[in-house]
Amino acid sequence: VEDRARNKMLVELVKKASAGTRQLLVLSDRRFHCEFLHQCFPKTSGLYMGGMKEAQLQESSKKKIIFATFSQAHEGLDIPTLDTVILASPKSDITQSIGRIMRETKGKKNEPHIYDVHDPWSVFTAMYYKRMKIYRQGGFNIHGKNVEEPKSAFPQGKCLFL
């Protein structure tokens, strides 16, 4: 949360992922982290956290970028237009979180993209391997470090970027 280089990387990742027509959900386990990242995108982003009024949540759900806590996304986030999630902080149980972008809706071709930020410290390595197992079981095309890069600028289908 307080790592400047990591936050700079996250800001650049959000810029890159939001350049097209995708609607992003950026998840962190810290409110402060969500608020900090939100300040970098004041016009195009909203917050989705516990303690907010329903009207505020509704307004945020219309934004191109939504910064949310894992706990709020786990409990009551239902935004059918979401198609991209960025996991901004380490977590092992991500099934509910990635499920938010996996829903099929009428008139929308579902090609979910997940950006999983892998923190290399040993305490987070076990979480990373649990997430990778979930992605493989879900049939994701995996792109990133030590993995073949996508052939096109905008990969098709369910994609995971490391």
Q: What is each stretch, according to the model?
A:
Residues 24, 43-46, 142:
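Hydrophobic anchor at the start of a short beta-strand
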Residues 46, 50-138:
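Conserved RecA-like P-loop NTPase helicase motor core
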Residues 29-31, 69-70:
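Helix N-cap/beta->alpha junction signal
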Residues 33-35, 74-75:
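Short, active-site-adjacent cap segments at secondary-structure transitions
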Residues 1-29, 35-39:
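Conserved interdomain hinge at the start of the Helicase C-terminal
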Residues 86-87, 143-145:
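Short hydrophobic alpha-helical runs that function as membrane-insertion/retention elements
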Residues 40-41, 100:
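Alpha-helical structural signal in soluble globular domains
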